[in-house]
Amino acid sequence: MLSRKQNFVNRILFGSHDRNINFDNFDFTTITISVFLAFFGILMVSSISFNELTTRHIFNLMVGSVLFFFIFRFEMSTWRNIDLYLIFLSLFLLLILLVPNLAPEINGAKRWIRFLGFSFQPAELAKLSLLIYVSSFCIRKKEEFKSNWTGFWKPIFIMVSLISLILLQPDLGSSAIIFLVTLTIMFIAGAPIIHFIAISMVGLFTFILMIFLVPWRFQRILTFMNPWENAQEGGYQLTRSFSAIGRGDWFGTGYGESWLKLNLLPDAQTDFVFSIILEEFGSFFGLILIFIFLVLVIR
């Protein structure tokens, strides 16, 4: 017999579907952490940016929450049945980015599709699609996957196809994430160690090659290693972020009391938000936040 709380949650999540939640397996830790991080994100965006960005952030969070409840209504088997369709959709959207004048160029890269006032990054769908596809493939083709090269290379081919299109944007970061996540799943699923080592070496060599063949990428690595050498140009953001961290010390200056966010640290609301968190809340809270993220990853 379901409790009143369980009946309420079932109606919210599944509507009229005859499906119940097994609360013994329900990961309340993950849900609690996710909700905390979502609300903390709102606080930091409010502290760093203008009202317009805060409103947009809250709206995007609401849209994401609706999508979460919608996706949660379906069994995992449903997503496994449409994994290839998701892959084809990802490939199609990534190809659209290559069509002239269809996608905006931002900071020298074409990564976003704008539609009806929304901005969407196809690489994010590609990550999710590949995650579902590789996981499903390792279950469906377990023996083939473990016993021969053919079974191993099928998901690798899909991965390389997606990465190739993402590199054309260019977006080396998303490509590296997709590569690492795919290999991690395959390793956990029991991929032959010789296959795993071979593809890892190829991937590492390609990653290094992509850095050295593109001058600005190589320069970024050098700047990252010693940002103070070019503190007024390439290393400006890094040195400013270090200043924010140092100003916050262990316990911070207080919520909303950051100085570096006042046009002294570019992209403070995106790439360097963690520096502002450490400035306002301190390095001690920063360590706690890192621990929370580690718990989320482990869960």
Question: Over which residues does each language-model region extend?
Answer:
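Hydrophobic, glycine- and aromatic-enriched re-entrant/interface helices and adjoining loop segments
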Residues: 104-112, 119, 195-288
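Membrane-helix boundary/helix-loop-helix interface segments in multi-pass membrane proteins
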Residues: 2-32, 36-169
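Transmembrane alpha-helix boundary/anchor motif
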Residues: 66, 74, 133, 208, ...
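Short loop segments and helix-boundary regions at transmembrane helix junctions
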Residues: 186-196
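Hydrophobic transmembrane alpha-helices and their immediate junctions
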Residues: 284-299
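Hydrophobic transmembrane alpha-helices of multi-pass, membrane-embedded glycosylation machinery
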Residues: 65, 175-186, 201-204, 221, ...
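Helix-loop-helix junctions and helix-breaking kinks within/between transmembrane helices
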Residues: 48, 52-55, 153-185, 213-218, ...
